[in-house]
Structure formats: C-alpha cells, structure tokens
Amino acid sequence: MTRGDAVNLPEVLAEITALFHAYEAAFMRNDVEALNHWFWNNPALTRYGIADLQMGHAELVAFRAASKAPDFTRTLHNIRITTFGNHTAFAFTEFTRSDTALKGRQSQTWVRFADGWKIVAAHVSMVP
C-alpha cells in the first residue's frame, strides 16, 4: 500500500519524466532496440496500438521489427505523469501528428523491477 505522501515523490517523478521523454525520442527515430528494452520482457505484457495488439514481449519485438520509422512528426500535449511510491508510475499524453487531423492518446504503466523501470502495459489510440 502506498501512503498518500508517497505520490509524486520528486526524485521518482523526475526519473519517470526523463524516461517518458527518452521513450518518445526513441519512438520518433525508430530505435527498436531501445523501445524493446523499455518494455517488460514477460508474456503478461500488453500493448494496444492504433491498429494492432501485442500480448507478450515476443509479439512486441516482432511488431517493432516489422514497423517502419514514423514518416510524421508528433507534438505531445497535456502530459500527465503520476508516481506511487518508488515502484509504480502512470504516464498519459495527448498528441497531434503532422499526417492526420485525428487526435492521439497514449498511456503507459511503468513498474520498477530489479533491472530498472519497464512499461508493463501501454495503449495508443486516435480519435476524431
């Protein structure tokens, strides 16, 4: 159980915020190795994409290997990151892309393991 005063501990919030932005930079340059590294290497990993679904790290690795580098730019809006204690964080953002009028939404659930922070669940969607 997390004490109420353990929400958004400054050092944990700073750590996750930096990882969130590093993930975004890796996504935009299609750094597949970095992207795969940030996701939990476990069959319980879940990622819902815009038009795809990966259940488990092996499916995610296969998806990333087949994905092309983005041919658009992305601007993030309304980034909201909340941490609970030293081991759990949720990151949400809205985004716009240069190739569509649709509005994007993204969420990531991060957990700190012995080998560092990992995304254990993620969701990306686009809406009118």
List where the protein language model places each region.
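Short beta-strand edge/turn micro-motifs at domain boundaries
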Residues: 90, 103-128
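Surface-exposed, charged secondary-structure patches
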Residues: 12-15, 50-51, 59-103
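Short, low-complexity N-terminal intrinsically disordered segments enriched in polar/charged residues
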Residues: 1-41, 53-54
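Short beta-strand segments enriched in hydrophobic/aromatic residues
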Residues: 39-40, 95-97, 123-126
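Residue-level detector of high-confidence beta-strand sites
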Residues: 48-50, 122
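Structural motif
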Residues: 41, 84-85, 113
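General beta-strand recognition
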Residues: 34, 46, 89-90, 118
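Hydrophobic pocket/interface hotspot
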Residues: 23, 34-36, 60, 91, ...
